[in-house]
Amino acid sequence: MKNTDTREVIMISIRLSDKNLQADYYPFILEPEARHLFLKELASHFAARTDLLDIQQHLDEILLTLDGRQTESYTFALTLPRLISITLDTCNACGKNQQWFRSLSACIAMDAGLSRPIRLFISDTIPPIIQWTGLHADRVSTLTQEMTAGNSPSCLITHALYKRLSPSIQSKYATLYYIHHICCYGAEL
């Protein structure tokens, strides 16, 4: 893929948050381990997929970029909330067995539209840094940041993604929300 390749993408933000289950327990070192375990479990859902273009992990957020030119990518994206719920259950069970006294939860936002990868090559030993054009990453990141306050469902799709869905699937996302002037539709995890 060249820097000039503009394509239809599905941008997904998964923002993790954790809850302390014991008032006097402060596991500073275990939070990165919990995020690593979640990412490892999440990666297993993408092992056989060819439509994953990019995955980036930030402190409490994972940004996924799927190829939006494939119809099945939209179907798969809409199954992600269920897969993430299963992944969270696995991670929380593991944490409980390890006596971490933390519980992970996630908020998910999805957007779709045209984007183009911009690759920055630093050296032969370091993989290129990829940044996607368009506001899709910013929009989903803004949504999940606001969703952590708990004032909306744990899964939102933007109108740009909504209009690409069949009417039968659209009916499952019937509740309209406006968050930071972003029109989106909600569903619970």
Regions found by a protein language model. Give the residues of each.
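Short amphipathic alpha-helical segments
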Residues: Y25, I122-S123, I169
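Catalytic NTP-binding/metal-coordinating core of nucleotidyl cyclase/transferase enzymes
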Residues: K2-T79, I86
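Catalytic core of nucleotidyl cyclases, primarily class III adenylyl/guanylyl cyclases
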Residues: D51-T75, C91-G134
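Alpha-helix/helix-capping structural signal
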Residues: S17-K19, G113-S115, A160
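Amphipathic alpha-helical regulatory segments at dimerization interfaces
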Residues: E41-A48, L83, T90, C94-N97, ...
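Intrinsically disordered, glycine/charged-rich C-terminal tails and inter-domain linkers
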Residues: M1-M11, R116, R139-T142, M147-L189
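Short glycine-aspartate micro-motif
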Residues: M11-S13, S105-A109, L156
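Generic recognition of short, well-ordered alpha-helical interface segments
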Residues: T79, L135-D138
